[in-house]
Amino acid sequence: METEQAPRPAEPPGDLTTAITAPGEQLLTLLDRHLPRIRAQAAPNDRDSTFPAATFHGFARDGVLGATVPAELGGMGVSRLHDVAVALLRVAEADASTALALHAQFSRGITLTYEWLHGPPPTRKLAERLLRAMARGEAVIGGAVKDHGRETTRLRPDGSGGWLLSGRKTLVTMAPIATHFVVSAQAPAAGGTTLLYAPIVARDTPGLSIVDGWTGLGMRASGTLDVAFDDCPVPAGNLLARGSVGAHSDAALAGQAVSSVAMLGIYVGVAQAARDLAVETMARRSATPPAASRTLVAETEARLYALRATASAALVNVDELSPRHDMDPDERGRRMMTPFQCAKVMVNQLAAAVVDDCLTVVGGATYAAEHPLARLSRDVRAGRFMQPYTYADGVDYLSAQALGLERDNNYVSLRATRPVDSR
């Protein structure tokens, strides 16, 4: 993503401990005010699957929800994904569900900023309007990507220049408070081509409904619900073009990497929180820790270092390549996505291993549902299901890159070509 800031090296490099820009430091300072409340509410919100709406109202008041909006539009101007990841890491140490929901808002600020800078005039106008509303704390924008069951979310012309949207999305994070949704949808075109669009739909649009009742294994307080669309009217100016199904264009990978790579910080934060709980528990015990427990603690320290270094390298890579619009678009997309996917595989594996070992160190008390390590053990597993890519799709992508195999790497397009019972 574009930036005029002069970043300085993190101290120590690759540690994901500090921000590298002044706006990033400002964001961390603001978040520090909210961390005690987030930490205190994590357990009851997880138990009851309650979204922390009051916390997000506080975020709106303090400007946190506009952190990734450019300063020219009233936002904080955090543009380095490294700094976004550090912020999410801090929040995830207190509560991963809150961090996941906040990521959805941060990601939208980043991607809409790109549309504002590089999109056609109608798109720039739409992006500016939404970004200014985000900066004021008035717009909370969720992403609705995954179709529910066998349904396919589709657009069709309304006969007067606009569109009608129908379908149902699942796993829509931050749905309880979202004012808008960016929806992945398909529309037929001449010649049998199927086009991909991202209509932006306001919550109060006729035909839109929030479907409550989701009970997840982890991230239970993230407000992850279903959203249904029944002939929702969408003005032509509220539509973002996203290519076509089966185009095999890797240029789309750049935007997908930019919008998702900072999420690595969430799972580093979960692993760090588990480590801290385990070490604090051992320190309170009067007996000298047994050799087996000390071995697990030592391995946890090494894994945490690897986690932070791996995630940091992927973030730096995306930050450096994001403004390189002089490159071949497909090559740029692959060079941003491939290190991200290598890091995602390792972060997901190592973070889960850290949490599992911390359960072993602390012992049987962690088997109680209310123990904080029990919550962390469920939350950390969400990473394997996040796009791009899920673990299975990530294996397909990385192995195809290594072996030179042809495939459609745009997961939105690829999903549209799969049989409905395998999505």
From Swiss-Prot:
Disulfide bonds: none annotated. It comes from the Bacteria. GO terms for biological process: antibiotic biosynthetic process. Its EC number is 1.14.13.-. Keywords: Antibiotic biosynthesis, FAD, Flavoprotein, Monooxygenase, Oxidoreductase. It is an enzyme of class 1 (oxidoreductase). Its cofactor is FAD. SUPFAM superfamilies: Acyl-CoA dehydrogenase C-terminal domain-like (SSF47203), Acyl-CoA dehydrogenase NM domain-like (SSF56645). InterPro entries: Acyl-CoA_Oxase/DH_mid-dom, Acyl-CoA_Oxase/DH_mid-dom_sf, AcylCo_DH-like_C, AcylCo_DH/oxidase_C, AcylCoA_DH/ox_N, AcylCoA_DH/ox_N_sf, AcylCoA_DH/oxidase_NM_dom_sf. Pathway: Antibiotic biosynthesis. Pfam families: Acyl-CoA_dh_1, Acyl-CoA_dh_M, Acyl-CoA_dh_N. GO terms for molecular function: acyl-CoA dehydrogenase activity; flavin adenine dinucleotide binding; monooxygenase activity. Belongs to the acyl-CoA dehydrogenase family. Nitrososynthase involved in the biosynthesis of rubradirin, an ansamycin antibiotic. In vitro, catalyzes the double-oxidation of TDP-L-epi-vancosamine to TDP-L-epi-vancosonitrose. In vivo, probably catalyzes the formation of D-rubranitrose, the nitro sugar moiety of rubradirin. PANTHER family: ACYL-COA DEHYDROGENASE, ACYL-COA DEHYDROGENASE YDBM-RELATED. This is Amino sugar nitrososynthase RubN8.
